[in-house]
Design a protein with these regions (language model features):
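Peripheral, non-catalytic segments flanking oxidoreductase cores
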Residues: 1-316
Length: 316
């Protein structure tokens, strides 16, 4: 049994004031408590999800030499392929037992951001790969926009407070492959304990055991989504902005039991980032005598760079 509350986005999108109010209350309470929620009623169709899994499994099954051709130097892994074991959690030397791909923002009307963001990388071996990735990116971005609108209302802000900051934001869709484990890992996990950098994360593929979340009692609890649910969690940027009113909870992906070592695991997080200029200064209505300001002022772009250095993806 998962300890993570479930909510339905269609309640927020409905014309029913009580349903909308309850959604805001439930997601706000969950994010103030454990920092995670399981969300149904999102914009991903089963057909699109099935297509994406088919494409990413085909990509990760390519010969290593072909995959390595898509690993782009000098951009901190922001686009294209990142090979097995390259990323590690903050404070860890051991690389995580995973390889992954990054789809980034598709800027349409902002030449400055087109220049700032690296271009997406086209996989020539798989003609549908990029189109399916782009459509998934768009649907998750749309879902995230409405989740943030609900959170804005929970924080007594204008409903559209986040809209201008997330339009053309530096978001990332990351299909991850955790390959079969062939020998006992030395201190490495599929994904070591970490907090996410961004505003919120929308995770596809949390239906099986593996993802664990640390609760207030320092206990690791399973986070298991229902068949059509996304797992959504608060990232460090949103935690900073709200002076830790909304909790960015430490989580990890544990190694499977030995009898399952021969199996792959796939999961697909969407990291919702704002534009680099967004100030992450603590909101005034989240600071008072009982809750003094905990974080220095910083922009989203400067904070992201700090964290990429810590992860080993960008050199100082």
């Amino acid at each position: 049994m998962s300890a993570i509350p479930s909510v339905d986005l269609q309640d927020f999108l409905s014309d029913h004031p009580q349903k909308k109010e309850k959604f805001i209350e439930d997601i706000g309470s969950a994010f103030e408590d454990i920092g995670f929620v399981a969300l149904s009623g999102h914009f991903l169709s089963k057909e699109l999800v099935d297509k994406l899994y088919s494409e990413i499994k085909a990509f990760f099954a390519l010969d290593q030499e072909k995959k390595d051709a898509y690993e782009i130097e000098g951009i901190g892994g922001q686009r294209g392929y990142t090979s097995f074991g390259k990323e590690h959690a903050k404070g860890r030397k051991e690389g995580d037992l995973k390889e992954f791909w990054h789809f980034g923002q598709y800027v349409t009307d902002n030449p400055k951001l087109e220049e700032e963001y690296p271009a997406n990388v086209t996989v020539t071996e798989l003609p549908e790969f990029n189109a399916v990735g782009k459509e998934t990116f768009r649907m998750l971005e749309k879902t995230a926009k409405y989740v943030l609108r609900a959170l804005a209302l929970h924080l007594n802000l204008e409903e559209t407070y986040f809209d201008a900051y997330i339009k053309n934001g530096n978001s990332i869709l990351r299909p991850i492959h955790y390959p079969p484990i062939t020998e006992a890992p030395k201190n490495a996990e599929r994904a070591a304990a970490h907090g996410d950098i961004n505003l919120i994360t929308l995770l596809m593929g949390a239906q099986g055991r593996g993802l664990q979340v640390k609760n207030h009692n320092d206990e690791w609890v399973d986070a298991i989504a229902g068949p059509d649910e996304l797992m959504i969690n608060v990232g460090d940027m949103l935690s900073r902005l709200t002076n830790n009113k909304l909790k960015s909870t430490i989580h990890k992906v544990i190694n499977p039991p030995k009898e399952m070592w021969g199996t792959s695991r796939y999961s697909i997080p969407f990291f919702m980032h704002p534009i680099s200029e967004m100030p992450l200064n603590c909101l005034e209505n989240c600071v008072d005598e009982a809750h003094p300001k905990q974080f220095e002022d910083i922009t989203a772009g400067a904070y992201l760079n700090e964290r990429l250095v810590e992860l080993g993806l960008v050199k100082k």
